[in-house]
């Protein structure tokens, strides 16, 4: 059975952080991504934070409260390194504030780094992403993973 909340999804997005060894937590930015019907990752948008916030289209005060909440809780962990917290927005504007926590380097952080390096809308091929025949391509402002299998 699929939770009704997920059936009404209109947007996948994430908050990207890094937890430092001294337990300080830095908010790196937002990422917006697409998934298929099965929920599998499709691609990230490589855009400015302003462009991503327009896509997210949620009250800024709510987003700031979520950032503070996640920073407070991440600071209490023994982990240090990159973290992405996946969220979703529903048709009525509700936010699911924590679908998944990725305690690792993730595609959202890579999209932030690519935007910093190349800007919005750049086309960049990155190969190989993995030893297993995958490629990454940034095209029309979207970060996509392509399988050669």
Give short role names for the model-derived ranges.
Residues 1-3, 69-73:
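Short secondary-structure boundary micro-motifs
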Residues 1-39, 88-97:
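Phosphate-binding site of ATP-dependent enzymes
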Residues 2, 87, 101, 144-149:
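Short beta-strand element of the conserved SAM-dependent methyltransferase core
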Residues 6-8, 76-78, 136:
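Sterically constrained small-residue positions within well-ordered secondary structures
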Residues 17-71, 78, 102-129:
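ATP-dependent carboxylate/phosphate-activation module, predominantly the ATP-grasp catalytic core
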Residues 74-107:
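Conserved metal-phosphate-binding beta-hairpin within the catalytic cores
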Residues 120-149:
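Peripheral (often C-terminal) accessory segments that flank ATP-dependent C-N-forming ligase machineries
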